[in-house]
Amino acid sequence: MKLRVVGVIPSRYGAQRFPGKPLAMIAGVPMIVRVVRQAQKARRLSEVWVATDDKRIAQTVEKSGARAVMTPSSLKSGTDRIAYALRDQKVDIVVNIQGDEPVMAPQAIDAAVEVLQKDRKVLMSTVVIPLRDKREWMDPNVVKAVLGLKGDVLYFSRAPIPHPREGGMPKAYKHMGLYGYRPGWLQVMAGLKPTPLELTERLEQLRAMENGVVIRAAVRKVESIAVDVPADVKKVEAFLKKRK
């Protein structure tokens, strides 16, 4: 029987560092539409939705032909929005796709799904990229991951980890804004209170780890450019121009 795998892109208008970010035009196309189009290329997704509390975003998504689900504005996180959107749905795997990665590789989405398909004991998955640029490694806007021998994440941090005692650049990984969930665990996680490390690093995935849930990572050599501030739009446009 074919699995129902739903990719959901949580999206809100009022980003603190970049208000209106989902509707920012990137080479003539709203960013949220670019994210949807990339997600729709993933072979392992059955459906792609956008979960938002903003009618402007919903209208833009629906105009592009994709599905938008309205969620309450009181929800504080993307995880909460996804859990709400899927609360009455029967799905096998859920993928949380960040709305600020307009060149997200479809292969990365498929990799997150594949981790959960291979091992039914794993409740949550993600994707990391080998990190070789020291400036990115030092950048607090770039989230780093340290992995165990089986690919399970030991920690996520904005700090440059692991720390090489003898100096130089260590074997490091950059975390992509992408998660796969078992639907039951997603609903549980959304109901948990924020945890100390989550609040310290401002990284929601640490809530799962602090509650004893293993997050398994797939390592993929793919491109990933997150749009955090307006200047990042130019980086994405330069990448798209170079790729043509």
Outline where the language-model segments fall.
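Conserved core of the sugar-phosphate nucleotidyltransferase
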Residues: M104-T195
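Short phosphate-binding loop-to-helix
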Residues: W49, K55-E114
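N-terminal glycine-rich phosphate-binding loop and ensuing alpha1 helix
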Residues: L3-A51
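A conserved hydrophobic position in a structured secondary element of the catalytic/binding core
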Residues: T52-D53, M104, Y181, D228
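Hydrophobic/aromatic residues located in beta-strands of well-ordered beta-sheets
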Residues: G7, V48-V50, V94, S125, ...
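Short, high-confidence coil segments that cap the C-terminus of an alpha-helix
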Residues: L45, V91, D119-V122, V213
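Conserved alpha/beta core of the MobA/IspD/sugar-nucleotide pyrophosphorylase nucleotidyltransferase superfamily
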Residues: P170-K244
